[in-house]
Amino acid sequence: MEPTAKGRTEESFSYVIRAPSSEGFDIMNVDVKIDTSWIFQDMEDSAEERECLQEEAAGRPDMDMGALRRQLESSEQKLSAAEDKYVTSESGLRSRIQELELSERKLLRKVDQLSTHVAQERSAWLQAQEKLAALQGELASQIREESVARRQQWRLRRLQERLRRKDEALGQQAAALERCRRTQRRQLGLVREQERVLREQVQRLERNVRRLCRAAGLLLAQWDTAAPGSQGATEAAAELRALQARAERSEREREEAARSLQEHRATERQLRGQLEELRCCIYGLKLSEIGLQGQVEDLAQQNQCLREELGAQAPIGHCSLDALGCVQGDSLPLPREEALDPCRSQDWRNSLRSNDAPRQRAPAGQSPEGPCTWSRIRPGRASSVLAPGPETTSELPRDLAGSNREQLTLAEPSLDEQILLLVCGCPPEECLDESLLRMDLAWISENLAADPAAEAFLLVQTSALPLWGPAGDSASWRPLLLQEVPSDGQKIQEELATRSPPPPKATGHPGWDCHQTRGRGASLFHEAPYISNHPFLKKHPKDLKDTWNNGGGSLAGRTEEGKARGTLGRKGKNLGDKYQLSQESHQNLSLENGAGAAEDVQDQNGASETKAATCRPGSWQEFLMPLLQGEASVSKEGPESLSRRERVEGYVWGLRGGLSSENEEVAPPATFSRAHETKEPWPTDSQLLAGKVRATGRTARGKEENQVWLGNALLLQGGSLEDKGLEEEDEMPHQEASGLGCRGAPEEPDSQEHESKEMLFFAGETGLPLFPRFALSVEGAEPTDHGHPQAVSKGHNRCALTIDELAQDVEACFQQLSTLQPGSRGWQCSASACRGENWSFAQKWHSGWERAHSQQVWGNWGICSNEEAKSKESGEGDKPGKTTALGTSEVPGNPGTLPHWDEASPNPPQGPAEPWGALERVRSRFHQLISGLKKQRSQILHDNTKLHGDQERFHERVCALEREREREVTKISRLERDNHRLVGDISQLKKELDQYLQAISDLEDCNGKSYCKILELEEENETLKGNLGQLQKATSESVRKSKDTMEQVTLENWKLQTLISELGVSYKELIKDIVLGIEDMIRALSGENEHLLRRVHVLEREVTLQRSTDQGRLVRGREHLQGKAKMHALDKEVQVTPLTGQLLSRACGPPLEEEMSLAAGQTGPSTGTGNSRRGADSPPPSLVWRNTGVANALQGNVSGAEVKEAHLEKEEKRPRCSVAQGQALSSLSNGPMLRDSEAEVTEEDPRLRAQQLHHRVLTLQCQLRDQGAAHQASLDEATRLQEELQAKLEELQKKQHEAKLAVTPLKAKIASLVRKCRERNRLITHLLQELHRHGLGNLLLSELAQNMLNDVALAEYTATFLAPGVPETSHHLDVKSEMTAALRAQTYLLNPEMDSVLQSSLSSESWPIPEPEWPAQTAQLDSLKLPLSLVSTLDPGTCLAAVTVEPGLPAQRLQEKGGMPCPALQVDNVPAPSELLSPARILAFHQELRQSICSNSQVHKSPLELEM
């Protein structure tokens, strides 16, 4: 053999395996070396030995059989050495196989680690998905909370708007409450009544509905249970009609109830209007009654005054108690006053009884009234102020009414009226030549307001004039109004302002202690602690307003009641102004204008103007009578009427005692609730103090005092009258108060009553004297009638006697004066005495004329009152001209108009005596006066008689009115109870208003908290959005990394599987080549043995034939043998050619033909006789070309290292075939040479040749025996290898089953993930709809959600993994798309559900597929179609040798290698999409993986089994 051939007898196989790991890629190099030179080594050695033996035999013919035996033994040793080498190489190959198995196990472990890593990544991805779902849930909840918060915010805004509107409405209602408070009360009662009626109606209707339902149920039950018939249908129809009629009747009843409710409301309004009119009428009757009483009492008082002035001229001394006894006899009982406050009545009685114990009035510095004390402020000797001490402030009202109860506390002073009593007088020595002290009433009110804690009962003495009796009588004082003094008044103001009330002590007027006989009259002043306070008296309305705002108390809640009395106050003010004009025209001292001034004060904030009450010259009992009568006449009306009475009594300042606590507690609101609407200028000092001294001089003071007393007495009486009018106005919400009941007066049918009411109205408004009928007695219980007829008649006789006696005395005086001579001393004394008597008489005459003038005023009063009433009706009440006649009317013979009246000076002249003519003129004037007085006496007696008749008639009328009043009082009490109930309702409404305000504040607080919460939620939402974005980014990054890792793992798994498949194919090819080489060698050896046997037989025949030849021919034969040596060589080549071609065709026929076809580029028949062998054992040319094309076409898909390995294998196969061919040719060429040499040897030495042949036969038999043993050993080894492979196959099948079990939950998770994704998409869609519906759409969020919803891969997975059937996948796929799909979707392949579905679908078909389908499946690999006849005749070995690994289509590759068909899925007409993440491609790859796992058993099968 050639050296080149010897160098290439050993073939090396190198494999580079790259496996992925955590650190990158593990590269493993596998080198397999196979030495094939041992196969034909022994044949070469035997050929050399034969040549040597032939040469030796040719050279030494005597060579024996021992050398041949040694050669055979050496050849046997070589064969055994070759066999040992073969065994050694086989053991090395076995060890290499073990190494490959270990590497395979490592690769499988690596695959397991990768799958574990994939599972971990999948779990991490699932956790990320769960977190994402949780965040989406939180986002959804936050969105819901935000929507709820926004809805709540919208509701809060709406509530705020509603509350704002409600606040506006409440403000309007608060403004309207002052105007229509009583309307709301009435409406509340009506609403409650309506509610009650409606509730009854609703209950009745509910009962009817329940009855109807029960009837309908019974009817339906009867309808269901009754047999079909005309009678049942008729009854059912009748019942239905009855039910319908009942329902209509119920509806009609409801409508009638609504109409009746409206009618009831209208009727109630009408009745309330009639009731208000009746109240006005009753009020007018009451005024008429009180006016008549005042007229009667005034007449009696005038008669008493006339009797006192015109009586006998008795010496003036201390006044007795007769006048007070008259008061006691004329007083009436006061059961109401005693019932209201028996303690006060007892104190009053005790104070009136103080004449029995005059010195015990003020022991230990206290008054006998108990806790009530007096403080004394005396600026000089000109004035004294009596005020209650601080103990009296502790007495609080016992019974509170309405909401005023809550506003009175112990710390606040009482808000009742202050009674200011101004008593003015002068001593006898100062009353004629000293001006009266001025006291500013507004200043007094200011001081009172500045010290509201002190009870204001002021007894201001501006002069030291006695209060009773004429001049020179210290026992009787004359009360006067305060007069203006420019300097002393200012001093008193300063001193009173700087002094604080001293500690309580019992003080009184300076003259009280000296006149204890007047204790009863004086004790009346000590009743002042029972009089209510009034701390709101100031000089100006602004001061009043400031006082009220700073420390007033509860006036703000009470000013509502004053608005209804505005008209009344205005009318009273107008009348007060009229009366002021009339009083100024007469130069009267009056404070009636204080009513209008008080109403002006009340316009600003409801303050009251200070009034002053004065007493006429006479007894204090007469002064106290109208004051106390005002209390007695009202005390019968109950606490409600008393409370209203005190509202008007605030206009007048006077002594008022014995009031109950109910009267005290509600007085201030009435006092300050007059005429808020009037806009009058603040009255000046001249208006406030109408008691200025006019131009008529000091001589008219008595007349002024008289008329002021009359006006103030009527004011005091009118204070007790006007409260009833105010009481009636509390019940008239829509009716404007017309002032003291005048509106109801014209409606009376009796003209006399009408006139009397007009007169009373005018008297009540202007303050003309209407004296009360009753006055308290000393004991406080027994009233009498002033107008008793006997007393009047007695007074008439006394008046007549007094005038006659006066005339006689005057005449006697003048006669005595006439006897006196001028110039004598006695004349002077008599003249001075006469002057004193004349001055005394002038005073008496002045008083008498004063009564006459007041009587003349009363005569003109009826006409003026009628004119006043007419002027009020015609709207001319404001004109002062209507009432000036009342004050300007003069009586003939008025002393003010008598000639030379001012000549009678107040003081007796101190100069020389007047002439006698003056005395005559005085005498004549006195005579005229006496005649005038007589005429007046007759006129007065006539008028008295008429008045007595009128008094009797009026008395009867008064009794009827009293009875009527009692009835009306019951009605009033009932109305008052309704009023209290309505007040409670108003308080309830106020509480509800407070609750509403509290609810509003709570809602505002809740709104603020909600805003804060919303801001916090928005911030948290933004934070969560940021976290969600970061999480999404991290999730996408992890998913991307996972996908990249999965792609890498899939690619590495694919490469690993490709390498494993290539290794298996290479190993099978190697084993097959080895087996084929051994078989060829055995065939060649068996043929050689047969040839040797034939040659042995030929040689034996030749030996037998040539034994007879001679020795001579031996030399010639030897030469001939040497000459034909070359020819033997050629002959040997010719003889060996068929065997060589056969061996070549067997040993390396297919590879050689493949190499020849690859080299030549075409197919053709091979040389020699190999065509017959090729027809049976090798594939046809088309198949070879096809396999070659497939290998060439698929080499492009393999990596560069694999391509190099394939080329290296091909290059190694070529020299192996050539070497084998050369060995076969050399071994076969030895046969003819040996035969020729043996023929010559036979010819030379037949025996020797026979022995050699026999030895050779034995050797060959031994060799055959050894080769059989070796063949048997190789078969055993092949069987063992097959068993090992079968065990490995079983292990792989177990691993496949485990992989299936591991893959099953992953597939279920994929399906569940698909379902969750669908649910997530639905939730996102719902959330987007909710956001758009609430107006919270976000474009970025909508686009993001739309991108998530438009996931094509998710839609395909949904259609694939959640479909009821599994679609069949088409195999018409390109390799690149399959690889990409395998890389991108390996995590979604291992679905147990899909695996079970695939197994069920695959089990429905048989594994072998029809032969016509197989070429169609492989048509994409080659454009040439394989004939059906050739498919069944394919040799698996040749197919395995010709096919390379195709990574993308393992199923088709395995079909070509082993001829095993694989199952194919049915096409479901689902076109494979072009996306790389197509589920169809994933399913196809999944199917191929399963087929590759199932076909592992075919890959590892033994080549002997493949042949079998």
UniProtKB/Swiss-Prot annotation:
The keyword Zinc-finger does not apply. Residues 1163-1172, 1220-1230 have a biased composition (Polar residues). The keyword Coiled coil applies. This is Uncharacterized protein C4orf50. Keywords: Coiled coil. Residues 868-881, 1204-1215 have a biased composition (Basic and acidic residues). Pfam families: DUF4527 (PF15030). Residues 149-267, 972-1034, 1271-1302 form a coiled coil. Residues 248-268, 345-403, 536-575, 725-754, 868-916, 1158-1186, 1204-1246 are annotated as: Disordered.
